């Protein structure tokens, strides 16, 4: 059986690894390791003569060919964005596929055998569309993607391979080029389980580069009256120098930044020269690193843990090599971070271990990921009814019984949504389909079983089945919307910000739904009762029902509550009179009538679907 390689498909840089003789080994790029230990920079370039460049060769020529170079395509995965390059269009999947093809070729050269299968990692916050897009990119590259796993989960595998007999609470602090992911995991008896995830979608190494760029540019402007940031070529040179300085200051106390002929004036060429110390660098990045506190606090809160409960700290991503970053995280938790694995390589190595597990080369490891956001369907009144809560371990399958909202309803619409808001309109629509052919029946009678099934890659399949007829429809959620990692984080923040407002809105909808059900039940009760209820009682009920429906139409919540209470009391009084009347008719009739008046209190969720028009 051929090897299953592990691939860390990153925003700034990618990496790959494979398990050889039981140990994960990093796969080198054909060009060797570049600046800062980067094997496969996530750059794709097209030259004007039609040549395709990928990785370090593409990165090196980016300054001279900006219009033909694509960088950070990962941010566009799962969207319908198109890159327009020299008259041709490319999807993010195609761009990512070029990087994966490069990794595949170099892996085959390294191993001396064909490579067909891979495990690819994605950020913990990637939604169904983004995960599917990643699988599609693998397929375009000629790879059979055996599994999509979360990056922090892969990192845990890289560190946990030799610790199979311990029970641990682990925090993974993954600081990359543009994002921070904080994940807390439980590890025991070979099982990795995600407890919580958090992050900042605009915090990473590029922010540090930009801080250095701004500092140097401000200095240069004060001395020469020229803002280098307004000159594209000068800015690119400055940014490259800033990144180089950042990397060097992880191991030395000062570094020389020397950019001759950075610009020119009427007086001649201008040069930039500056000695940047580690102390000054740490001063520049301190506000950036301090932004880690909120995601760290949020992750602990989500896992219901305290700082002292954490047993291990794992640092992932190039910026975590910076001593100041490492010290910040260690000081936060009051313990030392783990060593022994290169932060730039850990994710790829963990993916390789998962590949070896799938290939049967490594035993006794079970991987349990979670879904990042709540999944559910839209029900009557626009309410989002959850089926699978956020942070549920996957793979998972959940079913729930729903019913119709109107008499003689023959079609229901299943609207699948994802998010943390109580109302479906505030969440993200993932897909919609109809279940037709439901036999006509009074509202509340049909039983529709809705099933959510998430596979090990986080891909969602939804089905709806009429239990009466056996008819079934389903949908597989693929890359059809534009929910990005930024939007996921925004949605979580909005859920907190609008919690009280959402609660009130949901309560109002539930009040209206309950009132409609009450009005329907009241009318049905007096109609079914016939002459067992006197006409004055019937007229009283009809009058209240009319007023209640008027209040529902005008959405007068206080009036709805008042009339609902009044109608409930009226129905109870009628029920009492009917019972007393029946009690005088003998034991047999009494028993029969009691059976007929029983309520159906099964698990069916009443009146949850609008009729499809």
Swiss-Prot record:
Region described as Disordered: 578-613
What CDD domains does the record tag this protein with? Answer: ASKHA_NBD_HSP70_DnaK-like
Q: Which InterPro entries match?
A: ATPase_NBD, Chaperone_DnaK, Heat_shock_70_CS, HSP70_C_sf, HSP70_peptide-bd_sf, Hsp_70_fam
In alphabetical order, the GO MF annotations are: ATP binding; ATP-dependent protein folding chaperone; unfolded protein binding
- Where is this chain compositionally biased, Low complexity type? 580-602
The UniProt record lists the keyword Aminoacyl-tRNA synthetase: no
> Which keywords appear in this protein's UniProt record, sorted alphabetically?
ATP-binding, Chaperone, Nucleotide-binding
Family membership, please give it: Belongs to the heat shock protein 70 family.
Q: Does the keyword Nucleotide-binding apply?
A: yes
What PROSITE patterns would the database entry show? HSP70_1, HSP70_2, HSP70_3
**Name of this chain's protein:** Chaperone protein DnaK
Its biological purpose: Acts as a chaperone.
Please report the organism this UniProt entry assigns to the protein: Picrophilus torridus (strain ATCC 700027 / DSM 9790 / JCM 10055 / NBRC 100828 / KAW 2/3)
Q: Membrane-spanning regions, if any?
A: none
Gene3D superfamilies to which the protein is assigned, alphabetical: 1.20.1270.10, 3.30.420.40, Actin, Chain A, domain 4, Substrate Binding Domain Of DNAk, Chain A, domain 1
């Amino acid at each position: 059986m051929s090897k299953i390689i592990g691939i860390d498909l990153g925003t700034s840089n990618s990496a790959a690894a494979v398990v050889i003789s039981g140990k994960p080994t990093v796969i080198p790029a054909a060009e060797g390791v570049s600046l800062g230990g980067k094997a496969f920079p996530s750059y794709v370039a097209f030259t004007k003569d039609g040549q395709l460049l990928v990785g370090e060769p593409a990165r090196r020529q980016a300054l001279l060919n900006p219009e033909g170079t694509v960088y950070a395509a990962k941010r566009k995965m799962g969207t319908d964005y198109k890159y327009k390059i020299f008259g041709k269009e490319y999807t993010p999947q195609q761009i990512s596929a070029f990087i994966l093809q490069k990794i595949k070729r170099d892996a085959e050269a390294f191993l001396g055998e064909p490579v067909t299968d891979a495990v690819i990692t994605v950020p913990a916050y990637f939604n169904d569309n983004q995960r599917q897009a990643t699988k599609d990119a693998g397929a375009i590259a000629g790879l059979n993607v055996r599994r999509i796993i979360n990056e922090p989960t892969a990192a845990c595998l890289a560190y946990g391979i030799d610790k199979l007999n311990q029970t641990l609470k682990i925090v993974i602090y993954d600081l990359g080029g543009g994002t921070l992911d904080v994940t807390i995991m439980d590890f025991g008896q070979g099982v990795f389980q995600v407890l919580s995830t958090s992050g900042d979608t605009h915090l990473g190494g590029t922010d540090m580069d930009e801080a250095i760029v701004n500092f140097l540019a401000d200095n240069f402007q004060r001395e020469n009256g020229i803002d280098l940031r307004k000159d594209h070529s000068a800015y690119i040179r400055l940014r490259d120098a800033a990144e180089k300085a950042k990397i060097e200051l992880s191991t030395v106390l000062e570094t020389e930044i020397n950019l001759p002929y950075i610009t020119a004036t009427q007086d001649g060429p201008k040069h930039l020269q500056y000695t940047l110390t580690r102390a000054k660098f740490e001063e520049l990045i301190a506000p950036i690193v301090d932004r880690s506190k909120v995601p760290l606090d949020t992750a602990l809160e989500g896992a219901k843990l305290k700082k002292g409960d954490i047993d291990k700290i794992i640092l992932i991503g190039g910026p975590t090599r910076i001593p100041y970053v490492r010290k910040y995280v260690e000081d936060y938790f009051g313990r030392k971070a783990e060593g022994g694995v290169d932060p730039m390589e850990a994710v790829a190595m963990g993916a390789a271990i998962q590949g070896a597990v799938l290939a049967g080369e490594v035993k006794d490891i079970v991987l349990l990921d979670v879904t990042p956001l709540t999944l559910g369907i839209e029900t009557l009144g626009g309410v989002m009814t959850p089926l699978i809560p956020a942070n549920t371990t996957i793979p998972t399958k959940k079913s729930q019984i729903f019913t119709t909202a109107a008499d003689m309803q023959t079609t229901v619409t299943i609207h699948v949504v994802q998010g943390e808001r109580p109302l479906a309109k505030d969440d993200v629509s993932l897909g919609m389909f109809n279940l037709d052919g439901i036999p006509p029946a009074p509202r509340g009678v049909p039983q529709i079983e809705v099933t959510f099934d998430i596979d090990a890659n986080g891909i969602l399949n939804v089905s709806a089945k009429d239990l009466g007829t056996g008819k079934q429809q389903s949908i597989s959620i693929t890359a059809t919307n534009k929910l990005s990692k930024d939007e996921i984080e925004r949605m979580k923040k909005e859920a907190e910000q609008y919690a009280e407002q959402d609660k009130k809105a949901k309560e109002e909808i539930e009040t209206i739904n309950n009132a409609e059900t009450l009005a329907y039940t009241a009318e049905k009760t007096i109609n079914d009762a016939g002459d067992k209820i006197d006409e004055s009682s019937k007229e009283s009920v009809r009058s209240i029902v009319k007023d209640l429906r008027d209040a529902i139409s005008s959405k007068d919540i206080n009036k709805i509550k008042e009339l609902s209470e009044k109608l409930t009391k009226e129905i109870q009084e009628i029920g009492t009179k009917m019972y007393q009347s029946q009690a005088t008719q003998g034991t047999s009739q009494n028993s029969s009538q009691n059976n007929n008046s029983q309520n159906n209190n099964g698990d069916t969720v009443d009146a949850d679907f609008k009729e499809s028009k």
